[in-house]
C-alpha cells in the first residue's frame, strides 16, 4: 500500500511538473508571438511602479498591419475596412504600485477635450491616435515615381511610393499614433507611462472567448441595432461578438460615452476577476488560447517583459483592482472643430489621479462622501417639519444646512468641483449653464455591480 501511495505521488508530481513546464512554455510563446512596437521612451520602463496605458483602438487591421477579414468585420457590426478612423475609443491607465498591492485603473472618456501632444492643439483625446497615424501614413506614402527622377536613361528608376495599406506602413503609423497618445496622456494625468498595450476590434471578442466568457450584469434588457447587442437584464456571461458590442454600445444610454466607459470598466473588472481568481495565468490550456489571441489582436511596447509581469499579476487577488473615471465637467462643451466634447480640467485631473492612487494603495484614507443635492434637500425638509414655525432653531438649522435655494447652489458647485469643476464654473462661455457630468462610482474587480 505504501509503495502504491509513493507511486501515485511520483506520477502526480511528474504530471504537475509537466503541466507547469507547458504553462511556462506557453507564456514564453505568448511573449514571442505578440506584436511589439517601440513607443516608450528610454528608461521609462525600468521604474519599480508601473503605469500601463491600455488602448482599445477602432482599427480594421491586425497588429502586423494586415486588414481584418470582411466576414469578421460583418460579424462584429464594425462596418467596412475603410470605417473606424483609427481612433482610441477606450483609454485606461493602470497603476501597479511598486512591490505589488492594489492596482488603480483610471478611464479617460474618449471625447475629453484636451491639449494634444506633438503640436496638434486642443481636440478630443481619442484623435491623438488617429492624427499620429494619419500624418505618419502621409509622410511615408507622399513620394512618387517622379520624385528623385533619374537624370539619364541609364540611371535606376525611382521606386514607387508604398501604399497606405502596406503592412510596414501601417505598423509604423500605428506606432506613431501610440506615441502621440502616450505623450498626451502623460501630460494630462501627470503619470509617466512605463508600458503600453493596444487591442483592436477583434480583441475584445477573442479574449472573452479565450477565457470562457466574461461576467457582466445589466440593469435592463438591451436590443441595440447599432452595436448588435441583444442581451437580457441581470447577471450573465458575454463572449465573442456580444462582448465587443457590450463595450462599444453608446446609443440609447442615458449618459452616452460615460456609460460606455463604465461598461468597459465592468467588462475589464469581470475579465480581471476571472483571470486571477480562476488561475487562468497558471492554466496551460487557457494560456495556449490567449497566446493566439495576443498574436491576432494585441500590440505591446517592445520593452515589456511579459514573463515578469505575468508573475507579478499572479500576486494580485481578484478584488485588487479599482476602476475609476477622471473628473469631468459638461458633456456638451462646444468646440471650434470637434463638435460637442467632454470638458476636463487638467490640474484637477492630475490631483484626482494622485489622490486615487494614494487611496487605493492604502497610503491615504478614502475621502468622506459629499451629500447629494437631494439628500441635503431631504434633510432641510425634515428639519423644517420637526421644528416650530417661530423657532429660531429652525432658522439656524436651515442656515446650517444652507437654505434650500442656497444649499442646492452650493452643493451643486461643490459636486461639480469634484467631478471636474471647470465645467460648471463656466470655463467656456458657450457651456456655462450646462450641468456637469455625473461622477461614476469606483468599480472593483471583486464586485463590479450592474450597469446601464
What are these regions (language model features)?
Residues 1-452:
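Non-catalytic, solvent-exposed segments at the cell envelope interface
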Amino acid at each position: 500500500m505504501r509503495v502504491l501511495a509513493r507511486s501515485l505521488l511520483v506520477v502526480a508530481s511528474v504530471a504537475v511538473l509537466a503541466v507547469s513546464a507547458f504553462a511556462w512554455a506557453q507564456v514564453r510563446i505568448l511573449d514571442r508571438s505578440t506584436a511589439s512596437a517601440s513607443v516608450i521612451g528610454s528608461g521609462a520602463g525600468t521604474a519599480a511602479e508601473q503605469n500601463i496605458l491600455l488602448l482599445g483602438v477602432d482599427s480594421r487591421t491586425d497588429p502586423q498591419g494586415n486588414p481584418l477579414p470582411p466576414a469578421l468585420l460583418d460579424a462584429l457590426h464594425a462596418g467596412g475596412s475603410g470605417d473606424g478612423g483609427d481612433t482610441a475609443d477606450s483609454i485606461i491607465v493602470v497603476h501597479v504600485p511598486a512591490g505589488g498591492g492594489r492596482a488603480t485603473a483610471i478611464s479617460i472618456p474618449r471625447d475629453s477635450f484636451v491639449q494634444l501632444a506633438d503640436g496638434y492643439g486642443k481636440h478630443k483625446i481619442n484623435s491623438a491616435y488617429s492624427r499620429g497615424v494619419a500624418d505618419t501614413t502621409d509622410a511615408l506614402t507622399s513620394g512618387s515615381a517622379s520624385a528623385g527622377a533619374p537624370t539619364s536613361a541609364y540611371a535606376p528608376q525611382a521606386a514607387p511610393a508604398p501604399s497606405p495599406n502596406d503592412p510596414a506602413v501601417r505598423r509604423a503609423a500605428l506606432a506613431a499614433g501610440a506615441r502621440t497618445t502616450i505623450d498626451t496622456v502623460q501630460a494630462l494625468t501627470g503619470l509617466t507611462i512605463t508600458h503600453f498595450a493596444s487591442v483592436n476590434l477583434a480583441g475584445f471578442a477573442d479574449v472573452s472567448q479565450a477565457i470562457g466568457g466574461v461576467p457582466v450584469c445589466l440593469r435592463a434588457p438591451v436590443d441595440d441595432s447599432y452595436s448588435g447587442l441583444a442581451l437580457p437584464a441581470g447577471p450573465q456571461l458575454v463572449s465573442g461578438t456580444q462582448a465587443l458590442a457590450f463595450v462599444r454600445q453608446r446609443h440609447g444610454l442615458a449618459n452616452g460615452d460615460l456609460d460606455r466607459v463604465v461598461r468597459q470598466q465592468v467588462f475589464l473588472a469581470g475579465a480581471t476577476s476571472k483571470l486571477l481568481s480562476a488561475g487562468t495565468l497558471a492554466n496551460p490550456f487557457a494560456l495556449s488560447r490567449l497566446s493566439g489571441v495576443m498574436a491576432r489582436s494585441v500590440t505591446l511596447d517592445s520593452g515589456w517583459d511579459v514573463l515578469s509581469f505575468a508573475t507579478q499579476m499572479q500576486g494580485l487577488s481578484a478584488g485588487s483592482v479599482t476602476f475609476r473615471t477622471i473628473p469631468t465637467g459638461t458633456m456638451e462643451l462646444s468646440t471650434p472643430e470637434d463638435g460637442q466634447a467632454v470638458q476636463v480640467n487638467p490640474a484637477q485631473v492630475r490631483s484626482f489621479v494622485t489622490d486615487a492612487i494614494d487611496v487605493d494603495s492604502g497610503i491615504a484614507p478614502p475621502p468622506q462622501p459629499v451629500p447629494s443635492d437631494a439628500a441635503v434637500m431631504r434633510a432641510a425638509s425634515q428639519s423644517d417639519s420637526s421644528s416650530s414655525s417661530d423657532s429660531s432653531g429652525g432658522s439656524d438649522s436651515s442656515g446650517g444646512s444652507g437654505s434650500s435655494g442656497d444649499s442646492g447652489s452650493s452643493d451643486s458647485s461643490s459636486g461639480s468641483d469634484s467631478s471636474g469643476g471647470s465645467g460648471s464654473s463656466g470655463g467656456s462661455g458657450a457651456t456655462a449653464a450646462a450641468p456637469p457630468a455625473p461622477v461614476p462610482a469606483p468599480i472593483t474587480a471583486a464586485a463590479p455591480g450592474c450597469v446601464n
